[in-house]
Amino acid sequence: TNGGPWFPAYEKCDYHEIWTACGERLKESKIKTVGICYTKNSIHSKLSYENFVKGVLAVGDRIVKIHNIEEMKLLDQCHAMFQVSEANMSSPDNEFRQKLKLYADEKKKPRLVIDTGFVKNKRFNHEDLDRYMALGDGGIKRKARYFNEHSPSDRWKKLKFEMKPWRTTGKHILVIGQNEVGISSQHINVLDWWSKIIQEINELTNRPVLFRKHPSQRRLPIYGIYKPSPFNNKDIIQDLQNDIWCVVARTTNGAVDAILNGIPVITPDDWSMAYDVAGHDIKQINNPPTPDRTQWAYDLAYCQWAFPEYASGEAWLHYRNHLWPPEN
């Protein structure tokens, strides 16, 4: 203003520059910085990092690369963290992953963990990269936050996956194993549990028991009457098509495959992504629950993303908008 009778002391100034500067500071304050923590070095991990970084940058946020424990001090400038896989005893990066979890818990910072997806995850074909990878805050499987409660049907429809009706017949009980040193096996002696649960199944039903071994698992149940699955180390769909009455499992994603293919599941483990549509007591083996799976499937589709969705920023925005709502 040039001043005047009401504001004679005011000098002329450029409000455009002032408001532009204020706008830039406001924009700067809303930019989020994500610590990209390099915890795994497989081909799928490299693609996960590459595409997630593209997505963060695509929406105008920043990244800081963190390759080891010594560089973790850089996390102090970050609003959130991203890593591939959770800590487990068999990983050479186990200590790094454990320290990342401790840091996130102490600082109360979001820690996004990418892991194997649940539908169309292609985990039995490592060369096929057209796959879905799960993304959760604070962990993996059902111990992570996905901000997916009461999700709409859009992502499930996008998968174009036909969920099979519940099966009402079947000859075999399939017990699905997993890697005893994996992170989702650390809260239980899974080897002892397999023996115990197979013995209980033997007492409750005359149906023969098949045991599906994890490809990386060497030790097998030593008690109970069972036969090895004829499809060990092959796509689990072949097992599920082998006249299966019910699947019994802990936290393996094979339980999700069973549910999607219409085979009832019994799991006592709330780590399992199948838990909400499964039975939890082995005494249900002769009459396993077959609940409505519709909303469960919709919610499941919001737990996982394809590589192009990571690269576009769609996956990152889903979490960003829940962690820091736009109105804030």
Provide a role label for each language-model segment.
Residues 4, 26, 160-172, 209, ...:
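Catalytic phosphate/metal-binding cores of nucleic-acid and nucleotide-processing enzymes, i.e., regions
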